[in-house]
Amino acid sequence: MLPLTPETTGILNRKNMEKLPQGAYVINVARGAHVVEADLLELVQFGHIEGATLDVFGHEPLPPAHPFWNEPEITITPHIAALTVRDESVKQIAEKIRALEQGSLIRGIVDRLKGY
């Protein structure tokens, strides 16, 4: 999945999606702003893009009047990341504290400079 950066905003636009082979399928579970929604809708309606499954959108929640709801070739899934499992969370936090205290590598650090 791509981070949302100035370089990736709108990356799934008409110009780039037209480079996909006829009948390609678009899946976006990363960031809504990666997709130019009007371009995707037109390419699906014209048949160049076979369909799409989308979990993220430029505006969330997706407004009831959005045309994606009425496009049978676009599947919309609920944007639900995951449930937090208490025991697993406590274990991960303890491991990170232990690594910090020992001067070891702390796993799972978010790199804000990369846009994550």
Model-based region annotation:
Residues G58-Y116:
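C-terminal helix-to-coil terminal segments
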Residues M1-P67:
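Rossmann-like adenosine-cofactor binding region
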